[in-house]
Design a protein with these regions (language model features):
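NAD(P)-dependent short-chain dehydrogenase/reductase
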Residues: 151-200, 205-207, 243
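N-terminal Rossmann NAD(P)H-binding glycine-rich loop of SDR-like oxidoreductase domains
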Residues: 2, 7-26
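Conserved Rossmann-fold NAD(P)-dependent oxidoreductase catalytic core, especially the SDR/UDP-sugar
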Residues: 96-138
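Active-site Tyr-X1-5-Lys
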Residues: 134-162
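NAD(P)H-binding glycine-rich loop region in Rossmannoid oxidoreductase-like domains
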Residues: 39, 50-90
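Conserved C-terminal active-site "lid" loop/helix of NAD(P)H-dependent oxidoreductases
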Residues: 205, 235-241, 255-287, 295-299
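Glycine-rich Rossmann NAD(P)(H)-binding loop
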Residues: 169-171, 192-199, 224-234, 256-260, ...
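Mid/C-terminal beta-alpha module of Rossmann-like enzyme folds, strongest
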Residues: 188, 211-214, 218-258, 266-267
Length: 299
């Protein structure tokens, strides 16, 4: 665990960045950047010991920020729901600007996504797998561009960088598995790709906090590019069936080629550079449900 460092966390109100910032704030000076349009977000950061900074990574000038951060975890993102040019500018160009501005840091983590990969069928995706354009095309190609920009900046200026390709996170803060739980509780269908089983490697909050911090510690030049996921593989079909057993609801699956293709990452390299995850998926899903729905008695 890092101690006595000055750390910048962007996108700090998000489900991934907030738990990491909260953990680091116990022994470090943590600055949390986000738009902070809701006063409740600022209060939540202050309660966690995080220094809140209202900042829009897509519009504000990074020159206004301090340049003496020792570590950076860059999770701010434009999801690409609107103009594709804006997504490209925010995710790629502004990330490069921030990386250069924080070039004195001993470790910089750029949050990419496993959705940069083209679907390869029912086999795990290694970091060398080719890119593709899944359903969220704007987001995916902007992240591919961002990886290229950040890699160039890091190599050019000898900045230690880790690019993590986030695959499937979940926990008390939420995540896609939590979204699927809500569909189950509402007795609504869960859309899945026909190429079943839909395999994933979900990573629980405790583990992604630990591996997120580890990613900052191992940052290097040339940059490390690594899948960021759980050590265990489980299909959506199996984990939804397990959640159904816990809450007493049968999942309804709707198979359609219009659904997201499965994202099944190869975690061999992750185990080498970041380590293995510790929370088994069954324990993690039970803990997620208990945290998000304490009113439901679990069987």
């Amino acid at each position: 665990m890092l101690e006595a460092e000055k750390i910048l966390i962007t996108g700090v109100t998000g489900k991934i960045a907030f738990p990491i910032a909260r953990a680091l704030a116990e022994h470090n000076e943590v600055w949390g950047l986000a738009r902070l349009r809701d006063p409740a977000d600022r209060a939540r950061l202050l309660d966690a010991g995080i220094n809140p900074v209202a900042f829009d990574i897509g519009a504000d000038d990074v020159a206004a920020l301090p340049d003496d951060f020792t570590y950076v975890f860059h999770a701010a993102v434009d999801p690409g729901d609107g103009d594709w040019g804006r997504a490209l500018t925010t995710n790629a160009e502004r990330s490069g600007d921030l990386l250069y501005h924080c070039r004195a840091a001993r470790g910089f983590v750029f949050c990419s996504t496993g959705s940069v990969y083209a679907y390869q069928g029912r086999r795990p995706l290694r970091e060398s797998a080719p890119p593709g354009v899944p359903l969220r095309a704007n987001y995916s190609f902007a992240k591919v561009a961002a990886e290229a920009v950040c890699t160039w900046v890091a190599k050019r200026h000898r900045i230690p960088l880790t690019i993590i390709r986030i695959c499937s996170t979940y926990g008390p803060q939420g995540g896609v598995p939590a979204d699927r739980l809500e569909l189950m509780l509402a007795h609504k269908p869960i859309r899945l790709h026909p190429d079943r089983p839909n395999n994933y490697n979900p990573i629980y909050e405790d583990d992604y906090v630990e591996l997120g911090i580890r990613a900052m510690e191992v940052a290097a030049c040339p940059p490390i590019v690594v899948n960021w996921a759980g050590s265990e593989t489980v299909s959506v079909e199996d984990y939804c069936a397990y959640m159904g057993e816990l809450v007493g609801v049968e999942p309804i699956f709707e198979y359609t080629p219009d659904a997201h293709t499965p994202l099944w990452p190869d975690v061999t390299y992750m185990h080498e550079v970041l380590g293995r995850t510790k929370v088994g998926w069954r324990d993690g899903f039970r803990r997620m449900i208990a945290a998000r729905h304490p009113e439901i008695p679990l069987t």
